[in-house]
Regions:
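Pre-Walker A (pre-P-loop) alpha-helix and adjacent loop at the N terminus of AAA/AAA+ ATPase modules
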Residues: 53-96, 415-420
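Walker A/P-loop
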Residues: 85-136, 200
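Conserved AAA+/SF3 P-loop NTPase catalytic/coupling segment centered on the Walker-B
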Residues: 138-148, 170-204, 248-257
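Conserved C-terminal helix/linker of AAA+ ATPases
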Residues: 309-310, 315-340, 344, 503
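Peripheral, non-AAA+ core regions of ATP-driven protein-machinery
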Residues: 369, 375-556
Length: 556
């Protein structure tokens, strides 16, 4: 056999082997494709069957507010929200308020309200993108960021076409999805600081710039739209609406300075009852007045009231009833281990050493503050004991921290100094000032109330139980301005007070719109005593002390 024949045989053998190899590959691909198609059809059929199954509409969706009128008790907050977003120049907004008062519902409705305004820049197809800051986690390497967006570099893309070609692939985030609309971030106070800083840059530029080590302007293999994204950025012209249960001081100043702040207040009992009544009507259930009052007694916000109605309605439906019994609500309250709310009211009769102070906790939420004082003559040197207040507080930043005596504790010292000028010598008494309620009190606004209580306890003078008061006191007996006056006046009225004493510097014309309570501005502690003590010779005693003070001042 010649060498030519041998070469042909070898070539034939190799040709057969190569042919068998490619035939085997094609067969495997065909088998794999058939298997994938079969699996795909199976999954599609499963999805189709699942989509054919649907439950009835949950009660929670039935009672969800569909108009601003369904949001109870937040008229001022909604008015501010509309002013910020429904005009020709909408602004970024942060909504503060306790849970379950309608912050999220108002944010969902405000865009539809803005679309109805012909002067609004929002279009009919403007989107509302919702994001929960507690779950908006991101990768510090920039692989994934649901808020800002990210770039999938080829090393992370796997077997994709762009990955094999070495092309970075941009992925847009929620800020781009919300372009031309509203981006709502629930619990914005929980947002990671890095994401917060990135978003501040987006709010300024109104676009998102992405970076990648794999991107090159000279690379002609990269598609044109990716070049455009890296060079011009992703559009992100939206309006931010954030909601938080935190106080304004806990939100970074950088984001606060760029947003209009709107405050939603805590619902009172009557408003919670109204929410419960509306919820019962939406689920087509009848409920008695006793049941409504019971819900108002136990529910602390609108969401809790709706939950009580839903569970009670479920019990009634299971028993084929169209009305909710009081027993249903009692059972739900008992099984949920709810405790009734304690709403403080003024004491029914005047007492010695009992003063109605006022406090504020949370945005636009005030409360009556009972202040109890006893004064017992001491055998030797007396003492002053204060309970129920914050003794010490810490202030500072990340780099340094300062600890100091609390403002409430400092206010007690001011009170004792002023009372010494009125011949009330604390050294001769064992004085106990108590703030009951279990919540530590801080701040200087209870100064005039503590002074009134101590003077009453020492001189055995009755305090008018229908008067509430708030104000800081200086060591010269002057009443200084404080914060949260509007909320405190509303709380005094709700507690049954007929008069409320406030610092004169806090008096504003809009406070006269509060009906049902007399607002009395004062400048001196003497005025507070004249308005508070129920004793005929009180004026004479104060005039004597005032005359002595003026004589001493002239001699100096």
């Amino acid at each position: 056999m010649s060498w030519t024949n041998i070469f042909l045989v070898v070539q034939l053998v190799f040709g057969v082997i190569v042919g068998l190899y490619f035939w085997h590959l094609l067969r495997n691909q065909r088998t794999q494709k058939v298997s994938i198609d079969r699996e795909s059809k199976k999954e599609l059929e499963q999805l189709r069957k699942m989509r054919e199954i649907s439950l009835t509409e949950p009660l929670a969706e039935k009672v969800r507010p569909t108009t601003f009128l369904d949001i109870v008790g937040q008229e001022d907050g909604i008015k501010s929200l509309k002013a910020a977003l429904c005009g020709p120049n909408p602004q970024h907004v942060i909504i503060y308020g306790p849970p379950g008062v309608g912050k999220t519902a108002a944010a969902r409705l405000v865009l539809e309200e803005a679309k109805r305004n012909p002067k609004s820049p929002f279009r009919t197809n403007s989107t509302f993108i919702e994001l929960d800051a507690t779950t908006a986690r991101f990768d510090e390497r920039g692989i994934a960021d649901p808020l800002i967006g990210s770039v999938h570099d080829p090393i992370y893309q796997g077997a994709g076409a762009m990955g094999q070609a070495g092309i970075p692939q941009p992925k847009k985030g929620a800020v781009t999805d919300a372009h031309g609309g509203i981006l709502f971030i629930d619990e914005i106070g929980e947002l990671h600081p890095i994401q917060m800083n990135k978003m501040l840059k987006v709010l300024e530029d109104r676009k998102v710039f992405l970076e990648s080590a794999y991107y090159s302007e000279e690379n002609t293999m990269i598609p044109t739209y990716i070049h455009d994204i890296f060079q011009k950025g992703l559009p992100a012209d939206f309006r931010l609406v954030g909601a938080t249960t935190r106080s304004p001081e806990e939100i970074p100043p950088a984001i606060r300075s760029r947003c209009l702040e709107v405050f939603f207040r805590e619902l009172d009992t009557e408003e919670i009852q109204k929410v419960a009544k509306n919820a019962a009507e939406k689920v087509e259930m009848q409920i008695g007045e006793n049941g409504i009052e019971m819900i108002g007694m136990y529910a602390r916000n609108g969401r809790e009231a709706i939950n009580l109605v839903q569970i009670s309605a479920g019990m009634a439906i299971n028993e084929e009833r169209s009305f909710i019994k009081d027993e249903d609500i009692e059972w739900v309250v008992h099984s949920s281990q709810l405790t009734p709310k304690y709403e403080k009211r003024i004491y029914p009769i005047p007492r010695i050493g009992l003063v109605n102070g006022l406090a504020v906790y949370g945005p636009n939420t005030g409360a009556l503050l009972e202040i109890e004082v006893t004064a017992i003559k001491a055998k030797d040197k007396g003492s002053v004991n204060v309970t129920g207040i914050v003794e010490e507080e810490s202030i500072g930043s990340q780099t340094k921290s300062i600890r100091r005596k609390s403002m409430a504790k400092g206010s007690v010292d001011n009170v004792l100094t002023v009372l010494r000028s009125l011949d009330v010598l604390p050294e001769g008494y064992d004085i106990h000032i108590n703030f009951p309620g279990g919540i530590p009190i801080d701040g200087p606004s209870a100064g005039i109330a503590m002074a009134t209580g101590v003077y009453s306890a020492v001189h055995r003078t009755y305090v008018n139980n229908e008067v509430a008061m708030t104000g800081e006191i200086s060591i010269h007996g002057e009443v200084k301005p404080i914060g949260g006056v509007y909320a405190k006046i509303k709380a005094a009225k709700k507690a049954g007070a007929k008069k409320v004493i406030i610092p004169a510097e806090n008096m504003q014309p809009f406070l006269y719109t509060i009906k049902g309570i007399e607002i009395i501005p004062v400048r001196k502690l003497k005025e507070v005593f004249e308005l508070t003590f129920m004793q005929e010779n009180m004026h004479r005693e104060l005039d004597v002390h005032t005359h002595v003070d003026e004589t001493d001042a002239q001699s100096m």
